[in-house]
Structures are given as structure tokens and as C-alpha cells.
């Protein structure tokens, strides 16, 4: 894709990534998402594989027509994936980003936040929603 010309009519594409599906460490009464796992009873593991992560990032960046791209990580509880998963995501964003500005936001219930997570988010400019 040639990004040297961006149409004034170009529209960004937005999606939320759910790297753990509906898996969560809480069972909040108001949560609309806990029941979603029951929609696919044959699927025992709703965790995003690294192969799917790479394919998604490559395809998502390929379809973007804007110079700035946003990745929104949502759950279930996103921090149930290890930091290494998100480090891999950042590597893949750089690999397939073709120099574009890439931003990341992540939604968490906050119960699994540690100093290590906070350093990672700060060092990589994640917008964190709790």
C-alpha cells in the first residue's frame, strides 16, 4: 500500500482486540461480556495465539488508510495475557507499520496491575483505562 498519498476522504477503521476473549479474573454482576464464552461451547481456549496476533496486526495495518493507527485492547481481563504478549504485539506493529504512528490503549479492571505493568505501559505510551 502506498501511503505517500492519503485521500481526503479516507476513513480510519477501528476495532477492539480481545486477546483473552471473555476470560476474566472477576465476575462483576453488570458485565455484559461474561456470558459470551457460552456462545461457543466447543471452543475451550479463547486466548489469542501469537500466530493469530501476527496475522491480525498485519491485516489490520494493511487495511488502514490513515497515517495514525489505534489498537484498542479489551477483554475479558487483558492483563491475563503476559507482558511478553504485548511486547510481541509492539514488535509486530513496528514490523508491519511502515513508519506510521501507532497508538495503543488497553482496558483493565486494574486488579492485576503491578509496577512492572505500569513501567511497560509508561515506556510504550499506552493509554490505560481502568
Predicted regions: what is each one?
Residues 19, 75-76, 108:
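Short glycine-centered, acidic/aromatic-flanked micro-motifs in structured strand/loop junctions
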Residues 52-56:
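Well-ordered alpha-helical segments embedded in enzymatic catalytic cores
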Residues 1-10:
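Cysteine-centered catalytic environments shared across enzyme families
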Residues 57-58, 62-72, 81-130:
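Radical SAM/AdoMet-radical enzyme domain recognition
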Residues 43-47, 77-80, 105:
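Alpha-helix capping and helix-loop boundary segments enriched in small/acidic/polar residues
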Residues 9-51:
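Canonical Radical SAM [4Fe-4S] cluster-binding loop centered on the CxxxCxxC motif
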Residues 39-41, 71-76:
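Short acidic, glycine/Ser/Thr-rich loop/turn "cap" segments at secondary-structure junctions
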Residues 24, 28, 73, 106:
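Conserved, mostly hydrophobic/aromatic
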Amino acid at each position: 500500500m502506498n501511503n505517500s498519498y492519503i485521500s481526503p476522504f479516507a476513513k480510519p477503521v477501528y476495532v477492539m482486540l480481545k486477546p483473552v476473549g471473555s476470560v476474566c479474573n472477576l465476575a462483576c454482576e453488570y458485565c455484559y461480556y461474561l456470558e459470551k464464552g457460552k456462545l461457543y461451547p466447543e471452543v475451550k481456549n479463547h486466548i489469542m495465539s501469537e500466530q493469530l496476533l501476527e496475522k491480525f496486526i498485519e491485516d489490520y495495518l494493511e487495511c488502514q488508510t490513515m497515517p495514525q493507527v489505534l489498537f484498542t485492547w479489551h477483554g475479558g481481563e487483558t492483563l491475563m495475557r503476559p507482558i511478553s504478549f504485548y511486547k510481541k504485539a509492539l514488535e509486530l506493529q513496528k514490523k508491519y507499520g511502515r513508519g506510521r504512528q501507532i497508538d495503543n490503549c488497553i482496558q483493565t479492571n486494574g486488579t492485576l496491575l503491578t509496577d512492572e505493568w505500569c513501567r511497560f505501559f509508561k515506556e510504550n505510551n499506552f493509554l490505560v483505562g481502568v
